[in-house]
Each structure stands twice: as structure tokens, then as C-alpha cells.
Amino acid sequence: MARLCTHTESGHYLMALDAGTGSVRAVIFDLQGKQIAVGQAEWQHLAVPDVPGSMEFDLAKNWQLACQCIRQALQKAAIPATAIAAVSACSMREGIVIYDSNGEPIWACANVDARAAHEVSELKELYDNTFEEEVYRCSGQTLALSAIPRLLWLAHHRPDIYHRASTVTMISDWMAFMLSGELAVDPSNAGTTGLLDLVTRNWKRSLLQMAGLRSDILSPVKETGTLLGHISQKAAEQCDLQAGTPVIVGGGDVQLGCLGLGVVRPAQTAVLGGTFWQQVVNLPAPVTDPNMNVRINPHVIPGMVQTESISFFTGLTMRWFRDAFCAEEKLIAERLGIDAYSLLEDMASRVPPGAYGVMPIFSDVMRFKRWYHAAPSFINLSIDPEKCNKATLFRALEENAAIVSACNLQQIAAFSGVQADSLVFAGGGSKGKLWSQILADVTGLTVHVPVVKEATALGCAIAAGVGVGVWPSLAETGEKLVRWDREHKPNPENFAVYQQAREKWQAVYQDQRALVDGGLTTSLWKAPGL
């Protein structure tokens, strides 16, 4: 039987639970921010039969997987549970969990669950088509992936769950609840519900009332890095952590990732290169975009918000290109003992900037209010095999990802007045040295690449450490622990080439969107309700 831990201050390690879209991880860090061990398990979010767009989160199975990861991490680290000073949790944003009056989780969905497309359209028509603008003005979110249409969907289609609902939280809060029995949300993750006021960092209950929904189901709000509770006896027996270990409020994956990268001061900017690419800029005070092109999220740093733009499927597009067209390069890379992307980058480095005018059409710049993309394609190909080949297309894709990022950063600067003087490039994309240099050349900014490129779990561990007094504050610790791998300075000649390429791409992309509007091609992705 697990024993009550009464000396958590003697622990020498911190644990971060990271619930991503495709997997859950338990990561153990020492008090210098060094990663010691990881337990990881993939999970799937399955569609409900006859519910188009649904992506349910399997609460029972996924908790078992989380416990498995915790046990695995402890075993790999070869440390006792008493060595863990504190635990915190982070997760994909937008996903929500519903609880009944007994505190039992009864329903959950993952981040891009799109079942409520009809409800999104219905809500947009409220108050002479101004309801979404009011939601955005208050919360920095549109309705597409917010909790409001999902709750309305439950009221329409699952009234049994809707009427039993007593509390709603995010997925990170659910993991913390399963550990401690305490229910609360933090602003950085709960902000993506579209129900949190950017100024007060608390719930805006009137938005639910305006939608004709119940406003009595909102959890207490606690800031990241504060004490939530302690590991319960039940949780200790399930996952082998020590009962009584402090559980600290965590947050949203992107904001905690920025904390782990030291992006904690006003005007600091980051490009996070994963399956999706996010371009984030810290703002000193809450402000929203009059054109509703970008989302605004609470940072984990109190009083600070982040503008966030998203490039769709950027990393996924690169994987598609590698797997669909580069079987030969994958075999060669395997024989050489290197990553296939490294080989493709080496090939692409011999292609001149501008990639002979090839224009990839994949993700658009972010248009949060009316969010959809053109059909995937390559434009302006040549039939000269010396100029148009796999290396050229690969370089064109890397250049295009940087161009979309630059356009998104320009949109942010236009309404916020905040101009970046450098940026941090992290995530899987930042492993590419050519890609990092292209990003510098396209944006005209110095690009800093950290040693720890996947920093979400580190940011979560920082929250845990601050919560038990290991470190003094979130911002100070994030800056202290980040280490830099390399720096890329922009090449002025390449910058001029990319300025022209960017202007042409923007014009061509608008024509490609028009083909989607005319029903002639199929969008890469459309937001629910369009």
C-alpha cells in the first residue's frame, strides 16, 4: 500500500505529465532542468459512429495509459516515488472534460473534435450575427473549436450528459484531478474554451447565458505554478506515485512550451515547428485583432497574453512528401545512418533561394474568423529535370513554411504594434539547419535555436518546481534554464529574393482559394461552421 509522503521538500526530481494529441508522456527532470527519464504511450481519439467530425477522448483507457507512463518513467529513472518533489500536467488545448455532481468524469472530446459544425453556424447568427465578435472581443477565440458549440451540441444530442454536467475542465486539469481529486482550470488552457476573459483571467459567464446555456458548470480558476492539491491514496495505488506529493497547476502545451524556451517577456517571439506550426508573440497587455485573423491566448505568465497564428499541417506535409516521393532517399539515409530529412536538406541546400519559382499551395496564412485553405498543390513547376526535382520541391516546401510564418507574424505586428527583433525556432522543424537559415532569411530576423527543442514538458516541470518553492518564479526560471544550440543571421540578398516570392505566393494563393469557393477543388481543411 502507498505510504503518505510528508517530506516532499526532500524530493530531488519533478514530474511533468504531457497529454498531446497523439500520445501521453510522463517526463522526469532533475532540479537543473535536465531530462532524466520518459514514459510514453500512443493513444487514439476515435470517431463516434454516425457523429460526423467527432473525436472522443476515452477517459478510462487514457487514464490507464497515463498511469502506465508514470510507472515506466519511475522505473527508467530508477528512483523511488519519494524522490518526486511535485507533479504538474499539461495538454493539448481545446479538448474538454465534463464531470457530474459526484465529481465523476462522464464525457470528453479531444482538441479538434468538429461535431458541432451546425451549432457553430447557429451561434454565429445570434444577436444579428455579432455573437462571435463578442466572444472574440472578450476571449480572443472564435467559435470554431471553442467549448460553447460543443456544450450546445450536448444539449441538442446528449441531453442526458448535458443535464448531469456539473463541471467542465480541460484535459490537463482532468489529469491533475485524477491525481489529486481537486478540480480547477488554469487561464492558459481554459482560455481556448472561448469563455475566459483575457483581462480578468476569469470566466465570462455572460457568454454562456447569451448562448442560452448553463453558466453554473465552470470550475475555479487557478494560476499555473500554484498548488492544486496532493496525490490521493487512490491515485498512488493506481500509478505508484507517493500519496501526499504536491500536484501543481499546469497549463496549455504551447504556453508552457514557450516558458520552457524562455519566451516570457513582452515582444518575445517564437515559431514552434511541429505537425502544425505556431507563430507566437508575447503582448504586454490584452488586445485583440480588429480583423479577427489571429487568436489571443492567456500566457502562463500572469497578466501577459500571446498572439498565436497557426500554419496548418506544415510538419505533416513534409512527412507526406518524404513518404510519398522519397523512398530512395529513405533507404540511402538508413544505410548512411542519418535521418532522411537531413539527406533531403543536404540535397535542397544546392538549390538556389526561391526554388526556381516553384510555389507550394498548402496552408494559408491564418484567418481565424473565416478559416479555410486552398487545395494542396504545387504551382509553377518546370519540366526541366535539372531545375524541378525532389530537391527543388523539398526546398520549396521549407521556404513556403517560412513564408507563411512571416505573413502570420506580419499580421500580428499590424494590429498589435509589436515588432520582433529576433525569434526562437523550436519543435521538430528546428532540427533542420537549412530550414532554420531559410526562416531567418525569409523573416529578416535572427533565429535562435535551443538545445531542448521540445520544451513543453520542461515548461510543465518548471511550473511544478515553482509550485513547491524549488524555483522563485516562472519567468525567471524559464530564462535561467534555456540553453542555445545555434544562431542563424539573415542573409540580405536572400531576404530580397524571398520578399518577391512572398508577394507572388500571396497573389496566387488567393486565386487558389477562389477555386475552393467555386466548388472546383477541395480545401486542405475548413473550420467547423463554414
From Swiss-Prot:
GO cellular component, one term: cytoplasm
Location(s) in or outside the cell: Cytoplasm
Catalytic activity, EC: 2.7.1.189
Keywords: Cytoplasm, Kinase, Transferase
Catalysis performed (reactions): (S)-4,5-dihydroxypentane-2,3-dione + ATP = (2S)-2-hydroxy-3,4-dioxopentyl phosphate + ADP + H(+)
Domain of life where this protein originates: Bacteria
InterPro entries: AI-2_kinase, ATPase_NBD, Carb_kinase_FGGY, FGGY_C, FGGY_Carb_Kinase, FGGY_N
UniProt-recorded Gene Ontology molecular function terms: autoinducer-2 kinase activity
GO BP, one annotated term: carbohydrate metabolic process
Stated family: Belongs to the FGGY kinase family.
HAMAP family xrefs: LsrK (MF_02053)
Biological function: Catalyzes the phosphorylation of autoinducer-2 (AI-2) to phospho-AI-2, which subsequently inactivates the transcriptional regulator LsrR and leads to the transcription of the lsr operon. Phosphorylates the ring-open form of (S)-4,5-dihydroxypentane-2,3-dione (DPD), which is the precursor to all AI-2 signaling molecules, at the C5 position.
Name assigned to this protein: Autoinducer-2 kinase
Organism, scientific name: Salmonella typhimurium (strain LT2 / SGSC1412 / ATCC 700720)
Classification lineage: Bacteria, Pseudomonadati, Pseudomonadota, Gammaproteobacteria, Enterobacterales
